[in-house]
Amino acid sequence: MNANLQFTLNGKPQRISAEARRTLLEVLREDLDLTGTKYGCGEGQCRACTVLLDGNPVRSCLAEISEVEGRKVETIEGLAQNGKLHPLQEAFVQEGAMQCGYCVPGMILATVALLKRNPTPDQTQIIEALNGNICRCCGYVNVLKAVQRAAQPRKEAQ
């Protein structure tokens, strides 16, 4: 059965009709052509599919599309503004915090949520925010450095 849904996607109103049981990941990738959100394991274990729902990280491979009615969804495509990378995206580039890049959208969105809640996290808080985001290439050290780099201007401002 199809559901007619209204929600905000990357800051813009969105209306869709989709089978209510389809996952948010399927709709983002297949219907809306937002392929930055990755399909990893399909079981919610790797978190490559992380998006923000009302500012909180969710595994879009587990979330039914019907859950987004009236809510705000943010994907990796919505972070850059006016052709300028989000500070976390820029920090990931500067720190070389990726190799194949498959896990990066999920990691960036998880840490965007962290920095909104806590603009000056310590290393333990960063690790906790990334818990479950699996990367088989980079070894995480540069990911931690990237999040610390993005948080640094906030720390200096305090």
Outline where the language-model segments fall.
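Signature of N-terminal electron-transfer/Fe-S-associated modules in redox systems
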Residues: 1-158
